[in-house]
């Protein structure tokens, strides 16, 4: 497996990437010398990979137990964390146990939060099985679950001891999840690494068919992008906030859909809304908005709020964005990450955020919703989150 050191201030861990490397994954886990291995997966991933991986860990590394949770964003909450923690303790978890998060971003966040709480923190290893997880969520120390009032509002910062990624897991992903992952890649290119835009534009496939070489390049570029902005900001409260590009409207769309809109697809649409906001504020021109829509469409996501999502609900969730409090924003404003051009982030003082009038943001959401009503449904965000073979 190719090893990339990940360093964020005083936090560091190895990211190991390969293809068809399950033996290497098990061998790396064995080196940790755990008293037990607690593999956490949703019910879908458990059927595809969880039982087999747990059996191999049990045979080659040490006692292993598979803990499962229901699939989907609607189950990413404290109740699920509590149930899994009780199951872990029932199976004899102790301070020398290792928790293995096997799955996508939902499982990674649930498991990461559980690992941070058990015995006030036991070792965590991510084994991501989705594009979003491989190139985005496992590279963050943020471990959070949803609350009634919005996404990712309850959580901690907690680092894994390793990330073990095998692109072979991606072969069973439905196109919806592949497209979702590419939404985050487009974000990285637009906000952090504009040098990758030309190659990415050529590589994007609306049918979501990518070979292993392209996927490894996409993941490697995303590792570099994230490292560029988190090296001196492990908690993503300063330069790392750039990673929130597209997330203000994106999270609102995702939450309003009750998980039917995949995370990366929500972020992709959220970026097109952010670009339109930037245009309306006079920071960017129409060509910049067009570039966003072209890239998002090339990734297979309709660049509009989907017709089945109520724009009134989207606008309601905007007020609960998790970036509130970073700026002393005037009443009726919310802080957003905005760009004036690819790689050109707007700042308020040292912070990569701009206070945006909620009324203006809501107008941009309404405009995107009108375009969505005129568009054909896009597979990237239509359908329940557990419709495909992976979450």
Swiss-Prot record:
Q: How is the cofactor bound?
A: Binds 1 Co(2+) ion per subunit.
Q: One GO MF term, please? A: metal ion binding
Residues engaged in binding Co(2+)? 184, 247, 263
**What is the role of this chain?**
Catalyzes the intramolecular carbocycle formation from D-glucose-6-phosphate to 2-deoxy-scyllo-inosose (DOI).
GO BP of this protein? antibiotic biosynthetic process; aromatic amino acid family biosynthetic process
Q: Which UniProt keywords apply?
A: Antibiotic biosynthesis, Cobalt, Lyase, Metal-binding, NAD
Active site residues per record = 142, 244
Q: Name one Pfam family in it.
A: DHQS_C
Query: Which Gene3D superfamilies is this protein grouped with?
Result: 3.40.50.1970, Dehydroquinate synthase-like - alpha domain
Q: Which gene encodes it?
A: rbmA
Organism of origin is Streptomyces ribosidificus
Q: Which reaction does it catalyse?
A: D-glucose 6-phosphate = 2-deoxy-L-scyllo-inosose + phosphate
What Enzyme Commission number does this protein have? Answer: 4.2.3.124
> What protein family is recorded?
Belongs to the sugar phosphate cyclases superfamily. DOI synthase family.
Quote the PANTHER family the UniProt record gives.
3-DEHYDROQUINATE SYNTHASE (PTHR43622:SF1)
- Summarize where NAD(+) binds, as residue positions: 42, 73-76, 105-109, 129-130, 140-142, 151-152
Q: Its domain of life?
A: Bacteria
Q: What is this protein called?
A: 2-deoxy-scyllo-inosose synthase
Pathway, per record: Metabolic intermediate biosynthesis; 2-deoxystreptamine biosynthesis; 2-deoxystreptamine from D-glucose 6-phosphate: step 1/4; Antibiotic biosynthesis; ribostamycin biosynthesis
Q: Which cysteines are joined by disulfide bonds?
A: none
Cofactor dependency: NAD(+); Co(2+)
Q: What class of enzyme is it?
A: lyase
């Amino acid at each position: 497996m190719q090893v990339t050191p990940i360093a964020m201030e005083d936090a560091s861990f190895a990211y190991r990437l390969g293809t068809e490397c399950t033996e290497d994954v098990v061998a790396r886990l064995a080196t940790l010398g755990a008293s037990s291995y607690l593999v956490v997966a949703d019910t879908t991933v458990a059927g595809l990979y969880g039982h087999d991986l747990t059996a191999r860990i049990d045979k080659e590394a040490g006692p292993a137990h598979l803990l499962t949770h229901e699939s989907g964003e609607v189950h990413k909450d404290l109740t699920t964390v509590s149930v899994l923690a009780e199951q872990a303790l029932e199976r004899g978890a102790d301070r020398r146990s290792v928790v293995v998060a096997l799955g996508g971003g939902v499982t990674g966040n649930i498991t990461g939060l559980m690992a941070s709480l058990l015995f006030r923190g036991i070792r965590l290893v991510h084994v991501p099985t989705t594009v979003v997880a491989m190139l985005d969520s496992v590279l963050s120390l943020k471990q959070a679950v949803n609350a009634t009032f919005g996404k990712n509002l309850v959580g901690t910062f907690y680092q894994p001891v390793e990330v073990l990624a095998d692109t072979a897991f991606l072969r069973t992903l439905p196109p919806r999840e592949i497209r979702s992952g590419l939404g985050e890649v487009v974000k990285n290119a637009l906000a952090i690494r504009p040098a990758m835009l030309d190659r990415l534009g050529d590589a994007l496939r609306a049918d979501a068919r990518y070979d292993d070489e392209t996927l490894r390049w996409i993941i490697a570029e995303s590792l570099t992008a994230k490292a560029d902005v988190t090296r001196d900001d492990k908690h993503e409260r300063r330069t790392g906030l750039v990673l929130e590009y597209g997330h203000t409207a994106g999270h609102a769309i995702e939450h309003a859909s009750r998980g039917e809109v995949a995370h990366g697809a929500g972020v992709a649409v959220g970026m097109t809304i952010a670009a339109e906001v930037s245009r309306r504020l006079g920071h960017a021109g129409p060509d910049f908005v067009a570039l966003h829509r072209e890239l998002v469409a090339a990734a297979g996501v309709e660049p509009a709020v989907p017709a089945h999502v109520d724009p009134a609900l989207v606008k309601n969730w905007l007020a609960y964005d998790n970036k509130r409090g970073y700026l002393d924003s005037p009443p009726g404003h919310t802080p957003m990450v905005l760009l004036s051009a690819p790689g050109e982030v707007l700042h308020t003082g040292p912070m990569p955020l701009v206070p945006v009038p909620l009324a203006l943001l809501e107008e941009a959401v309404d405009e995107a919703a009108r375009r969505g009503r005129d568009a054909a449904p896009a597979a990237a965000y239509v359908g329940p989150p557990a419709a495909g073979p992976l979450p």
